[in-house]
Amino acid sequence: MNIHFKGTGVAVTTPFNGQTIDYNLFEDHLNFLINNNVEALIINGTTGEGSTLTEDEKLKTIEIAVRVAHGRVPVIAGTGTNNTQATIEHSLKAKALGVDSIMLITPYYNKTNQRGLLAHFTTIADAVELPVLLYNVPARTNMTIEQETVAALAEHPYIYGIKDATGDINYMKTLKSVVPDDFALYSGNDDAVLPFYEAGGDGVISVIANAIPAEFSDIYRTYQVNRHEAERQFNNLLPLINALSVDVNPIPIKALVAYIGYANGELRLPLVPMLEQDTKQLIELYNRIAKGSDLS
């Protein structure tokens, strides 16, 4: 399995039914995504509400995703926490279930320094011996992996890439200049994919692709042969992408995924549903795209 995918991976939502996960809907959604040409599944991350899943629930979603993917696309599980040893223990359980890669967020709350980040990620990679995707999302963790630290981590045989959700293209450009050519660089921001691709990025770990996987994943493939057409495709989807910013992720995308039938619209506290008027506007934009209207 080549875990260094090119194109669109999906940060998959987790459907709830009361106090439990609706595993049938989860499986249906995974098949929908794979059948609509996404290149990777990323589960139990921010968009999957991984921070409010129990360990048993996380392991069950991993088990299902590995079975459903069946080698068609890589499955990457968010296993990172701010507890190094707990992350190792959970990651080893994920490895035993056959996950292709783990995604490790920077430690949060017990904020460390760059030397601490280097030790944290290296210790986990050494212990788990599974491909590691770093996750840089300072807006949520108040911790940035500096480019020099990423470059040092890139020398580790199991650390193969990073999901960067800063939205800062200059950060990515500098990073590109200090890491090996085969180090994977993924955007965590749907609204920044074109400049990210122009700067040499390998793909995106997308939120909007939960609802429009075929349309959004086609942008990367089109970009390889016709940049102007890719820009047109992107601009047509941009109003819907921007509409997801009306509330905190994953609140808006879960409303949209519920509308297309792969969730029940439920969130786990402290997340609460969107305002009705915002949901209505989001669905109207989606329906216009579904009907082939040009929103650009």
Curated annotation (Swiss-Prot):
GO annotation terms (biological process): diaminopimelate biosynthetic process; lysine biosynthetic process via diaminopimelate
Record gene name: dapA
Transcription regulation among keywords: no
Chief location: cytoplasm
UniProt entry keywords in alphabetical sequence: Amino-acid biosynthesis, Cytoplasm, Diaminopimelate biosynthesis, Lyase, Lysine biosynthesis, Schiff base
Name of the protein: 4-hydroxy-tetrahydrodipicolinate synthase
Its job: Catalyzes the condensation of (S)-aspartate-beta-semialdehyde [(S)-ASA] and pyruvate to 4-hydroxy-tetrahydrodipicolinate (HTPA).
GO molecular function, one term: 4-hydroxy-tetrahydrodipicolinate synthase activity
Organism of this sequence: Macrococcus caseolyticus (strain JCSC5402) (Macrococcoides caseolyticum)
